[in-house]
Curated annotation (Swiss-Prot):
Protein name: Putative inorganic phosphate transporter C1683.01
An example Gene Ontology molecular-function term: phosphate transmembrane transporter activity
Residue ranges, compositional bias (Polar residues): 261-270
SUPFAM superfamilies: MFS general substrate transporter
Keyword rRNA-binding: no
TM annotation in the entry: 48-68, 100-120, 124-144, 154-174, 194-214, 230-250, 348-368, 397-417, 422-442, 451-471, 487-507, 510-530
Keywords, sorted A to Z: Endoplasmic reticulum, Membrane, Phosphate transport, Transmembrane, Transmembrane helix, Transport
Length: 573
């Protein structure tokens, strides 16, 4: 099926009009807009702060447990040294369950809020997840002192961190969908990356807050040995997240519905006419007779390939654009199933979901147990409890500053240059290589060498699949299924995180840290294979592709002149 659409350039009275790439049109429009920070407009900056603060909280709340775990060990389980039976005082099964609590809640939140966002709308849902985060945090830090059993205390923490995870999980599909739908095509990847990069600041803040709080309690902890004061430390660690959460709550609740979502709901009013017959193209010469030239260059290629190419995507004339707005399908269960019944759509969901799953096995396996890993490689030892906790926090801070945060910002500045697919592939390759080095030489590499490998792995994980697995579902799926598809992808990723949380300590005690690194390496290289299913989404407008497919009955077959371009840009199979 061929489609001839164009954006005229120049005087309408001229005999010849040239197609103009959409990115060029958007760039010209942006020249007339006031720039703010990092080239963002005021609206983009406000969107970045509202959605970005959510991911700041996501990272802070999800990873602060890594720094709280040693405190729980000292307070409730008699320290972190091994007992006479050779096992730690803090049972590994309970520790894994508490660490995984937020990730378990994430799955419910991502699926529930993703579906509700597509069914009820972004405006109806956005902000509700932050209410859950606030309530869960308050209840978490309000653990009564009347609970004496360490196991009961951990169950209290588990329950409210699970609810916290529901709210945090809901932020993933909603912030991704809203940002994608409010962004201009040539800056969409940068803006989504900026918002996701706030995760780095959240992790960094967690380490800094811990160091400051330990410093404030230095006298009673270090000099007097009053370690019960750690009760105040962990409650403040969790509780300080309330400040930004409350700050963005009202603006989120007041945010307007996105225009792209409104357009995707045109057929949801009960008028289920055939998209072909519901449009009126009788007066459009280009549609009646695609071979008509009239001075316009013809574009003889498939609609999906045409619209997906970042350097040739073009805007249709205004009358066609308005007609395409009515070619959408309602966001409901049958529409979702119908969309993903087609292999060329389902393979994208398979690619985004499995890549996220494999990534999170290694990513959360390292990050949720970073304090344990630092202790094992000899970095977090100290002469007393206070110095051990402080050195552990400093080790986490160094990893965040050296690898975690820079990785996000490399992605911000290069995502629109290198493209999503290349960044994801190189991230999987290099991170897998670091895990392979650690696995093969775990007992031979020095403490500094192991530490450097973890830093490099963090750098290329965040400048790679940790960022792009979030970007891909926001860009590759149209608005009518975007929230649900993003929620499914993220939820499967969290399944990998849960596996890592629950099995890491068990596996390291059975097969050792080196062999666990081999498992992480295999996950990274498995991600390479599933990345090949995905198209390059740089400059790709999934909503326009969806409208074209609906208009032509969903038979938009990809055609490319170059075999390399075909499998790389559009994905294999």
């Amino acid at each position: 099926m061929k489609l001839n659409i164009f954006k005229s350039h120049g005087d309408s009275n001229t005999a010849e009009e040239r197609p103009v790439p959409l990115e060029q049109v958007e760039a010209e429009d942006q020249q007339h807009e006031n720039r703010f920070w990092l080239g963002l407009t005021a609206k983009e900056f406000r969107l970045m702060m509202l959605a970005g603060v959510g991911f700041f909280l996501d990272s802070y709340d999800l990873f602060i447990i890594n720094l709280v775990t040693p405190i729980f060990e000292y307070l409730y389980w008699g320290g972190i040294e091994k007992g006479p039976n050779g096992k730690g005082h803090y049972p590994s099964g309970i520790r894994g369950l508490v660490n995984a609590a937020s990730n378990i809640g994430n799955i419910f939140g991502q699926l529930m809020f993703g579906f509700m966002g597509d069914f009820f709308g972004r405006k109806f849902v956005y902000g509700k997840e932050m209410i859950i985060v606030i309530i869960a945090t308050i209840l978490l830090i309000a653990m009564p002192k009347s609970i004496h059993s360490p196991l009961s205390k951990m169950m209290w923490v588990f329950c409210w961190r699970w609810l916290l995870g529901v709210g945090i999980g809901g932020d993933y599909p909603m912030s991704a969908a809203i940002t994608s739908e409010r962004s201009k095509l040539n800056r969409r990847g940068t803006l989504i990356s900026l918002i996701f990069a706030f995760q780095g600041f959240g992790t960094l803040a967690g380490a800094i807050v811990t160091i400051i709080l330990l410093g404030c309690f230095e006298h009673p902890l270090n000099r007097e040995g009053h370690y019960r004061k750690l009760e105040g430390v962990w409650r403040l660690q969790f509780g300080l997240a309330l400040v930004p959460a409350i700050g963005v709550l009202i603006p989120r609740l007041m945010m307007e519905e996105t225009q792209k979502f409104k357009n995707s709901q045109q057929l949801n009013s009960g008028d289920n006419r055939d998209p072909k017959t519901s449009l009126n193209f009788e007066d459009d010469e280009l549609v009646k007779n695609p071979s008509v030239t009239k001075g316009h260059p013809e574009i003889h290629e498939s609609s999906e390939n045409y619209l997906s190419r970042s350097n040739t995507v073009e805007n249709e004339p205004e009358n066609i654009e308005k007609q395409f707005e009515s070619v959408s399908a309602p966001a409901n269960r049958s529409g979702f199933i119908q969309y993903f019944r087609q292999w060329h759509h389902f393979k994208h969901l398979l690619g985004t979901s499995v890549c996220w799953f494999l990534l999170d096995i290694a990513f959360y396996g390292v990050n949720l147990n970073q304090s344990v890993i630092l202790k094992n490689i000899g970095f977090s030892s100290g002469t007393n409890e206070y110095r051990t906790l402080m050195k552990n926090a400093i080790g986490n801070l160094i990893i965040a500053v050296a690898g975690y945060v820079p990785g996000y910002w490399f992605n911000v500045f290069l995502v629109e240059i290198l493209g999503r697919k290349w960044i994801q592939l190189q991230g999987f390759v290099i991170t897998g290589l670091m895990f392979a080095i650690l696995a093969g030489r775990w007992n031979e590499i020095s403490t500094g060498g192991r530490f450097a490998c973890f830093v490099i792995a963090q750098l290329f994980s965040n400048f790679g699949p940790n960022s792009t697995t979030f970007i891909y579902p926001a860009e590759v799926f149209p608005a009518r299924v975007r929230g649900t598809a993003h929620g499914i992808s993220a939820a499967l990723g969290k399944c990998g995180a849960i596996l890592a949380s629950l099995l890491f300590n068990f596996l390291t005690s059975i097969i050792g840290y080196g062999n666990v690194m081999w498992i992480f390496c295999g996950c990274m290289w498995g991600g390479i294979l599933f990345t090949l299913l995905l198209p390059e989404t740089k400059g790709r407008d999934a909503d326009e592709i969806d409208r074209v497919e609906l208009f032509y009955g969903g038979d938009g077959k990809v055609e490319c002149n170059s075999k390399w371009k075909s499998w790389y840009v559009n994905g294999i199979f």
